[in-house]
Amino acid sequence: MEPKLKLWVEKDGVLVFSDYRAMLLDHIAKTGSIRGGAERMGLSYRRAWGKIKEIERNLGVRLVESEVGGPGGGQTKLTPEGEQLLARYRSFRAAAEADMKRDFAEAFGKPAVHGEPVEP
């Protein structure tokens, strides 16, 4: 057996941030575009942009900034606030996952080997 963690953050009962939304920001940062991030997630550009605007509205900060045109076309990058949100969420998630695994091991003990009983 192995524990799994599904994590999200709410503000006043409204979903603000989650693993899925963190992944979207990460893909945008890596590809340099909302379209590229959306494609990696299997989303339309419109849906990805809508998710970003929803997070920004709920948190009251800008997460991405876009530059239009130029020799290589436009580019989108995370704002310092977007980078900080992503870094803090990753850190929080890693700590929550480590705690969960520790608590799981304490509650269920080590996995059985070759049909041996599990020892707590």
Regions found by a protein language model. Name each.
Residues R57-R62:
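Residue cluster at the C-terminal edge of the helix-turn-helix DNA-binding motif
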Residues I28-E39:
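Short helix-boundary/capping micro-motifs
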Residues S66-Y89:
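Basic, amphipathic "hinge/linker" alpha-helix immediately C-terminal to the N-terminal HTH DNA-binding motif
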Residues K51:
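Residues within the DNA-recognition helix of helix-turn-helix
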Residues R46-R47:
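Key DNA-contact positions within bacterial/archaeal DNA-binding proteins
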